[in-house]
Amino acid sequence: MFVITADQKASRHDIDRAGSGRDDLAARYEGRLVLPVDRTSGDEVQALVADAATALDMVLLLTRAGHWSVGLGIGTVRTPLPRATREATGPAFIAARDAVTAAKRSATRFALATDPPTARADDDPPPALPGPAEVEALLTLLLLARDRRTPQGW
């Protein structure tokens, strides 16, 4: 599962974006959400999705807006699922919390985490698929390249 936690940047000095952000995400991703997008901690929104394509699209949308620090947590969630995202828990939610905290210190305001963290020893053979660190690096490159585009480039 993929948990996206987005924390509004400079929320004390900006308009409240969490309510409209939640509503916009809910409308845009209707039918692709495991649970409804929820507002958490006042200035945060959180979403739970089951597929990587939706998670990536949501990360790209939120970071493009420029108003959010975005954490992507990947892992399992505790079942049975509650009715509200803010009531759900599990390793993916813990990872998303760690990721959004790291995102606040990132130039792209994005970070990815898994729980438990996965690491490869130097002597391990490379896996067939990229690990979390490689995926985060690729997304960071994508975000940096995208941020250099002019409005006319869109």
PLM ranges: what are they?
Residues 1-154:
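Regulatory and interdomain segments flanking nucleotide-handling catalytic cores
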